[in-house]
């Protein structure tokens, strides 16, 4: 029998000398700040690896997208089915300054709206705001019973659907093209839907009219001054205030 060192016995000891390092010791916390258009500014915290050498933490933070419930941002449970996307555009100290990046409905809300015996009408419009943001808005609406209607179903004819869709497109185009992205985020939750509902009463009564989705297609060249103004540097008095713009029907003086 040959006498020598058993190599297999020494291999297992090498792994015992390794010291495990907690990866969170190399990370820093940054605060995520929402624009002043929302009542609640503090969205939450995010983690990122600490700046080391040529790897800058700010570069990893810029471009991050956070999804937040609009009910939490506006302190209103009526908006609990709306989700707002916020994108980090700039990092100031330990604060991540965000801008509006999109809006969507929760899947359970969308599924609860779709029912039998009614017609679903959808429309989408691509429009440019006054501050050169290219956005696409998706609208959704459902027919409802007329007053004193006995018939169970509320199906609209194809011509009525086309007329309603045309009206929806015109209203969205007019509202979105005449305001900034900040103003649009205030109009989207309720104002545009109410105006569409009132404008289409003569064609077919509608219910559950909403802008279900806002998609940001293209942003203008980054402007730090505009972003800082959006986060409290401007001297506007409408910070975090709800928009209550009522739709006024046109009255014909002569027939």
UniProtKB/Swiss-Prot annotation:
It is found in: Cytoplasm. Belongs to the eukaryotic ribosomal protein eS1 family. It comes from the Eukaryota. GO terms for cellular component: cytosolic small ribosomal subunit. It holds the Pfam family Ribosomal_S3Ae. One of its GO terms (molecular function) is structural constituent of ribosome. Component of the small ribosomal subunit. Mature ribosomes consist of a small (40S) and a large (60S) subunit. The 40S subunit contains about 33 different proteins and 1 molecule of RNA (18S). The 60S subunit contains about 49 different proteins and 3 molecules of RNA (25S, 5.8S and 5S). Keywords: Acetylation, Cytoplasm, Ribonucleoprotein, Ribosomal protein. One of its GO terms (biological process) is translation. The modification N-acetylalanine is found at residue 2. This is Small ribosomal subunit protein eS1. Disulfide bonds: none annotated.
